[in-house]
Swiss-Prot record:
Residues the entry annotates as binding L-glutamine: Y54, G354, L382, G383, M384, Q385, E405, R462
Keyword Metal-binding: yes
A cellular-component GO term for this protein: cytosol
Family: Belongs to the CTP synthase family.
Regulation affecting activity: Allosterically activated by GTP, when glutamine is the substrate; GTP has no effect on the reaction when ammonia is the substrate. The allosteric effector GTP functions by stabilizing the protein conformation that binds the tetrahedral intermediate(s) formed during glutamine hydrolysis. Inhibited by the product CTP, via allosteric rather than competitive inhibition.
S-S bonds: none
Residues the entry annotates as binding CTP: S13, D148, I149, E150, K188, T189, K190, P191, T192, Q193, K224
Glutamine amidotransferase type-1 domain span: 292-534
E.C. number: 6.3.4.2
CDD domains for this protein: CTPS_N, GATase1_CTP_Synthase
Enzyme class: ligase
Protein name: CTP synthase
Xref: InterPro entries: Class_I_gatase-like, CTP_synthase, CTP_synthase_N, GATASE, GATase1_CTP_Synthase, P-loop_NTPase
Organism in which the protein naturally occurs: Bacillus subtilis (strain 168)
Amino acid sequence: MTKYIFVTGGVVSSLGKGIVAASLGRLLKNRGLNVTIQKFDPYINVDPGTMSPYQHGEVFVTDDGAETDLDLGHYERFIDINLNKFSNVTTGKIYSTVLKKERRGDYLGGTVQVIPHITNELKDRVYRAGKETNADVVITEIGGTVGDIESLPFLEAIRQMKSDIGRENVMYIHCTLVPYIKAAGELKTKPTQHSVKELRSLGIQPNIIVVRTEMPISQDMKDKIALFCDIDTKAVIECEDADNLYSIPLELQKQGLDKLVCEHMKLACKEAEMSEWKELVNKVSNLSQTITIGLVGKYVELPDAYISVVESLRHAGYAFDTDVKVKWINAEEVTENNIAELTSGTDGIIVPGGFGDRGVEGKIVATKYARENNIPFLGICLGMQVASIEYARNVLGLKGAHSAEIDPSTQYPIIDLLPEQKDVEDLGGTLRLGLYPCKLEEGTKAFEVYQDEVVYERHRHRYEFNNEFRQQMEEQGFVFSGTSPDGRLVEIIELKDHPWFVASQFHPEFKSRPTRPQPLFKGFIGASVEAANQK
């Protein structure tokens, strides 16, 4: 029978519940169990697709085209699995489904209520995640903090599951904060006690408490937390701040987190074999050189908006025994006069995705600077589009060339709306989303790094390169190295006489793994390392 683990959080948000859940998933997977994982977000949006990155951070896209929470990126990278639309559930999705059922008459004229209709729908999403993947264990992270009004139906649903399927099949892990009070020079357990008290008042007794802390906590403090929260002392797991995220699974294993889970759930499985993971952590802790990549974006004040991009850069760096630092460059501040200064000290330039006109001209300037000065360059989504616009303007001489998204009246719409998008009115969930094939041209840099004729990558866009300009651009040395199999859509562009100038319409960052870097990132970082070594 499938087992269900729920990870909740207390005291404050952004405690790292997602990292704890992902780390546990990795440990259980390495014990030979089939693990899947999901995130429940209590906000009323149907998904984060239309939310500002300043509000939510990155939107992570799955193979099947779901626009999801950035924690799913952590899950995929840590556990090395591909998730799907059942892996992210929001209040908006649940209410939308229940209201559709009510309109169809599925409830036979009954009064639709939070209990049982909303809670039943929530439980169904948990069960479905297990059925769709045939999982031995489903880990569900509940977003937000215990005590939030929005979280109450979620907590009630997971409370009910203990009665529905039995105590040994359900487990609750609660993440809390033990803050350090600098003036007193002490760690304080009271917030944890109150958080657990709040959770217990809702009918949930945590089996394990994971304590986030700036510094090690004493055994006496663990005993105190165990006493007040009514759990075994060994079930108080310390999670100290770490410089290297990938060390956390090993720290949790050292304290027996996965063993506690297996004992409670009567899971007969081998010890977690973590030698490959230990090699990764050892490598990350002992990198021999450092390079700096300039990231030119519009959301640089919030690094979480580019979290998968940054992680992918780091993964690629590991392959070259290199620590990759990121220099954040606000695209709105970039001009022809200051680009050299803003990118000084960098060994490569990356222009990631984005929407809207803010900062686009700065990205075009940065792209031109990389092209003209033989600086390794990687463009993603909008980054590919601005690379195309820049080339059209400054090499082909098409003054005023632009994207129809930004300048609908441009004489040279190098980037235009996808034909199938012309009648679309809604913004949410209507982009070209998910995994699509890309056919690579032999003899190109893209083919060289992928070593494959057809590759599959994840997309999130509404605009595309305008084929009316394709021949004209090709004649001037612009290389279309990847297209859709029918040749209709441009997927990758590059330049021949350049150390590395490659850009993709898709989002390669969504498929990178710490032990298996994504090929375009690996090629980009390889060129950047070479450039750094030649200085």
